[in-house]
Amino acid sequence: MIGAFARKFFGSANDRRVKGYQSRVKAINALEPEIAALSDDALRARTAEFKQQLANGKTLDDLLVPAFATVREAAKRTLGQRHFDVQLIGGMVLHEGDIAEMKTGEGKTLVATLAVYLNALAGNGVHVVTVNDYLASRDAGWMSQVYSFLGLTTGVIVHGLDDVERKAAYACDITYGTNNEYGFDYLRDNMKYRLEDMVQREHFFAIVDEVDSILIDEARTPLIISGPLDDRSEFYNTIDTFMPNLEKVADYEIDEKQRTVALTEAGMEKIETLLREADLLKGDSLYDVENVSVVHHINQALRAHSLFTRDKDYIVRGGEVVIIDEFTGRMMPGRRYSEGLHQALEAKEHQPVQPENQTLASITFQNYFRMYKKLGGMTGTAATEADELADIYKLEVVEIPTNLPIARLDEDDEVYRTQNEKYAAILAEVERANARMQPVLVGTASIEKSEVLADYLTKHGYKQIDFGDPKSMRKLYAAARAGKPAKLFAVLNARFHEQEAYIVAEAGVPGAITIATNMAGRGTDIKLGGSLEMRAQFETADIADEAEKQAKIAEIKADIERFRGMVLKAEEVVEIEPAKGSKPAKTVTHPGGLYIIGSERHESRRIDNQLRGRAGRQGDPGRSKFFLSLDDDLMRIFGSNRLDTMLQRLGLKDGEAITHPWINKALEKAQQKVEARNFDIRKNLLKYDDVQNDQRKVIFEQRVDLMKNESVAETVADMRHAFVEDLVAKHVPENQYPEQWDVAGLKEELKRVLDVELPVDEWAAEEGIAGEELLSRIESRVDEHMAAKVGQWGPDVMRYVEKTILLQTLDHLWREHLVMLDHLRQVIGLRGYGQRDPLQEYKSEAFSLFESLIAHLREAVTGQLMRVEIVPPEEEQPALPEMEAHKLDPNTGEDEMALAQSSFARASLASEGSEGRSRRDPNDPESWGKVGRNEDCPCGSGKKYKHCHGRYA
């Protein structure tokens, strides 16, 4: 209470910060007449003047006022739009590297031009990040008019561009693209072998549109570039046939809050029986160590069948299982669940099971965007996640006042006992709104729910149409002109994502009914009366004559204005029945405008606020209401049984709803609990990912340094000497007498790893020889061996071979390291049972693994360079490791490794030996011939070849 009083008296911290920008807003406004008087050429010349001032020592902050005034005037001349004062404040927040929370329709896209232009003057490149290719292309095409007028270049990164096009786009002053494309380009760049092949520049400044969606909703989803492993499709299909035999509760239990599933004792026995019948069980028990892989597959199949629902979590399309974004309802083609879950879903849906993948490179959005020296963001809903954004990204959320007061009415939720009662109430509400020609947007939580609602409308006389189809739209426009409801509706979910922009843009036409999953269509405004841009695109496409086209556009404008007036007047007058003995009935007027109906609450308040925010843009009237049932996920998980009992005691009849602000508050508290839990999960995951991220930065920085150096001979020599030192120290310890030295072991290992025969036994037998002298002689002979290769091939060829082997070996070992870190991560939680901190244990063991990686790198590079031979051109083979030669997982969109291979087609490593398996001598690697990476090592160690002698092959 005291805090509320203080805020009322002194103002909130947000109010004070917004107030602090007013002096600069006034200064920008004062410059407006002067800037407006400039010619186009003079206005354009200001860019060069600003750059010169920066070169002379001024800062970007010094140039903010004149630069913003310049952009405002350029926008007026090119777009016919003038930045409002509140938009200037939004631009300042972005420039300072914080998040501007601006309500729907307040012009976030235009706001970005202010901070983008100012920071682009530094010449380091500015990245504008959007959630999909459509918005990236749209915003780049639209705002490039302002930038090009002022002499700056604009590029756009979308799916399907080749490296030449990408590099050109990144070289521009300003680059638009999606979060996925930026992240994947970063990963692919760090798999390149030449600096000139890398496409991205440094990470200077980025503005993230819909920042909450990218930095919070997608924070737990890593970007992964991967390559296929062995085909195990039959195994997945076999395991899948077991699932129908299991019964919920009796054989497995589900924890919906934690999204986990576990077999019961009876379920384990049933699975063991099925595995024995299929001859897949090794030993006596499912949980014997040799069945670890089988248990993993069982668990993933169980998750696929019990936790993942078709048309809610994923969709089957074109023979593929495509993930659906739980927050936006959009399909995410190319994204695949990891650890065999996606393969389990493919088996469940009887689709072709794709091979499992090995991670080649990965990064989370959390760590990618933290690489930028400065980061800003825009969204309509970030205040509820302000703590997380400040904690993880050091970004403050500043709520920007709206240009006009919000006129939307947010009504209390209506809670029904069953889904059917809820849908009946939604139908009745839609019919009332449709009768008065008020456009309605119904938000659903999944494709499944959107299609249930669509079926419900269809059964009651409504017809589903495509808002992207001109013929269908003409029917809707004709009905609107006549003022009669057409009873037409459109569905926007992952099945119809191609029409997303059209459906959302026309959702404000009188009588339009749109069913949309969550926040699909985010980024496209719903304008009351419809979109001039979309209608002009439809209705003038076949008109060649310019005069006729302009006349048609004028006609459309008049139509839209008339439609807008109809929507604004679509008010509802409701009579409230009086209680017994009270005064006569009262009437309440509910506003017109867009009517938002939520069909259930989401786990996050922010998603609900986003849905509400579709209505009431730029001071327009609007209303929103959520219709809930006790069967809804959130209600069911958070104690609907108690509420159901209470409603029955209160005598709530079928079809009746309960409405009270207390219910809204209770639901918000439940949502806050979920949000807090999800925040803790993301924060904890980040702590683990930071360990890998620190190692990733070291490896990637080293790769770039190696590529920058014309010669890596010195690095290779240091690695060679360090390896020889380690080898000698292992067999000839400092504090031992010569007769205690393992001379035979040293000689054998020098032959096996370095392929050199040295008289180590003779040297060690010399009177008075010390370990240091022995080391010096070995190093000299090894250096002579390498010098002979340089003399044989020439320094140019040797430089190329050294760099090639060093980079490809580093990449190979890094991939193996990622697999080991992943395995460590999966089991480290068990350390908690031993009263040890899993995170500290993970850090310690991850560091040990990293040290081991460096040691293996020295050994492998030295061994390969000592053995490498030039192959004649007609027998050339790619120099890249086998794993790199495969096509990448679809989530990258490109076979980047094929490009990398081509740059090394001039050299290869000679194979040591070619004899068949039957003649392999465990003690003679030269007799092994070609050994598969996943075969047991012929030396008899019991390890896979790739983890044993394969390191040196």
Swiss-Prot record:
Disordered as annotated region, ranges: 873-953
Biased composition (Basic and acidic residues): 914-923
Keyword Chloroplast recorded: no
Cofactor(s), names only, from the UniProt record: Zn(2+)
GO annotation terms (biological process): intracellular protein transmembrane transport; protein import; protein targeting; protein transport by the Sec complex
EC number: 7.4.2.8
EC class: translocase
Function: Part of the Sec protein translocase complex. Interacts with the SecYEG preprotein conducting channel. Has a central role in coupling the hydrolysis of ATP to the transfer of proteins into and across the cell membrane, serving both as a receptor for the preprotein-SecB complex and as an ATP-driven molecular motor driving the stepwise translocation of polypeptide chains across the membrane.
HAMAP family for this protein: SecA
Name of the featured protein: Protein translocase subunit SecA
